[in-house]
UniProtKB/Swiss-Prot annotation:
Coiled coil: none annotated. GTP binds at residues 13-19, 41-43, 314, 340-342, 422-424. The keyword Metal-binding applies. Gene3D superfamilies: Adenylosuccinate Synthetase, subunit A, domain 1, Adenylosuccinate Synthetase, subunit A, domain 2, Adenylosuccinate Synthetase, subunit A, domain 3. Pfam families: Adenylsucc_synt. Substrate binds at A308, T309, T310, G311, R312, Q313, R314. Belongs to the adenylosuccinate synthetase family. It is found in: Cytoplasm. GO terms for cellular component: cytoplasm. This is Adenylosuccinate synthetase. Mg(2+) binds at D14, G41.
Amino acid sequence: MSKNVVIIGTQWGDEGKGKIVDLISDRAVSVVRFQGGHNAGHTLVIDQQTTVLHLIPSGILHDHVECLIAHGVVLSMSALLKEIAELEGANINVTERLKISPGCPLIFPYHIALDNAREAKCGKTAIGTTGNGIGPTYEDKVARRGLRAGDLLNPILFASKLKEVVEYHNFLLTNYYGTAPVDYQVILYEALSQAKKIKHMIIDVTEKIHQHIANDENILFEGAQGTLLDIDQGTYPFVTSSNTTSGGAVTGSGVGVTDINYVLGIVKAYTTRVGSGPFPTELIYNVSTNKGDAIGKVLGTVGHEFGATTGRQRRCGWLDMVTLKRSFNLNAVTGICLTKLDVLDSLISVKICVAYKLNGKEVTIPPYDAKGYTDAKPVYIEMPGWKTSTIGTNSFDSLPIEAQNYIHKIEQLANLPVDILSTGPDRTQTLILKHPFE
């Protein structure tokens, strides 16, 4: 019997979702992206060759896998065509296997201009977006003025809609933000030129998904970013503009709630965050000055914690079970995939946050707002480290006993099994204890 599996990041993103999607998508007929845009970066390492994907589903490296970009994704045609060219330059067949929903909101230069103008105006209080126009594009979608991929199929109507939207956003850019306007004719010409290259990929993605379900075929839904960046459930306002939880797979692709059979929650063995926002277990280290917490330096250096999309330094800290348990509930996680265990290999001891001290009380339920997270002080348990390499370990029993104990403690606190264990960046450096499609 087939399964529909959702892969979700349970922290602030960068948990290692891309590698796991690539790993288990060999069992799937189709891989579906359902939210976000090219602000996400999924890094795959296969036979020591690194591929970074931003829009195209991570199943693209398997020749038999169909890759679907559903209507919950905001689409930059420029970013998509660049990614296609890079993959096809590496002899990977993309255009015959990639399909795009007509409902995908399109990202244009005025979205990027607005994104950057807002961040500049906010100054030190800026959220720290990727500057790719994601937020303004979702705003246009909700305001019902956005242009979608399906509009490209009617160039005359597209041009008319675009003119109206450009006038609106140019008013904002010039009169509120005091920045230069964008050129309608330049945007129109570029968009229609790009449309010629992607129009043949635009199909009813939702119907395609339901055909696979009717045919009893495995489907993998690939989440981007992480639960704590969810527009509704994350550390608002330091969040992204889409629903990054498993519920987003339903609304962002058009399947029903009961169509989902298994949710794999990706958990990094420590915690990272890019950009601004509260981070209770952060071990502050600044790579540019080489000053700060020694453990934070180890996590960032050994873990190569720099954003795949922006190149920015990721902030690092201990594993936070307070936020994770909330994430597991929000996503109805079935099993855990624990990644980057090997980054902890050199540490004498490891810590897990099991509660917060907030307003003089010890709490195990996370606060609802960013200020509460900022005020929260972590309460840790400390466990012995293993000081032995776990990279490429080929069985659970061959792990150091201290590493096994760390994993078992996570399972105990989460009340969930660790079904997959990643012990290195390469596809082969993974222990599958229970396959999500079985």
